[in-house]
Amino acid sequence: MKEQTPIRKAVALHYDEQKDKAPRVIATGKGHVADNIIKEAKKAGVPIQEDRTLVELMRHLTVDDQIPEALYETVAEIFSFIYKLDESVKNKK
């Protein structure tokens, strides 16, 4: 029996601390749409974090939805890591 390749899924988040109470979904998709989300993020220099479990927890969200409170801590840790990485790269230039 041939093993099936899992369908790729992606969720893109944005957080504007001046406007948003929590990070919100700006794009979501699976298959080719997910591939395009990832491709555009890479092209724009947006950091990508692969986490299948987190994507599964967010799969029911739609564009402009804020993430549920239960995910605040996990997403905050990811955003913090990305921010620190970004600052580290800027300081090396």
UniProtKB/Swiss-Prot annotation:
GO terms, biological process: protein secretion
Organism domain of life: Bacteria
SUPFAM superfamilies tied to this protein: EscU C-terminal domain-like (SSF160544)
Annotated Gene Ontology cellular component terms: membrane
InterPro entries: T3SS_FlhB-rel (IPR004683), T3SS_substrate_exporter (IPR006135), T3SS_substrate_exporter_C (IPR029025)
Coiled-coil ranges from the UniProt annotation: none
PANTHER family to which the protein is assigned, alphabetical: FLAGELLAR BIOSYNTHETIC PROTEIN FLHB
Name of this chain's protein: Uncharacterized protein YlqH
Species of provenance: Bacillus subtilis (strain 168)
Lineage of the organism: Bacteria, Bacillati, Bacillota, Bacilli, Bacillales
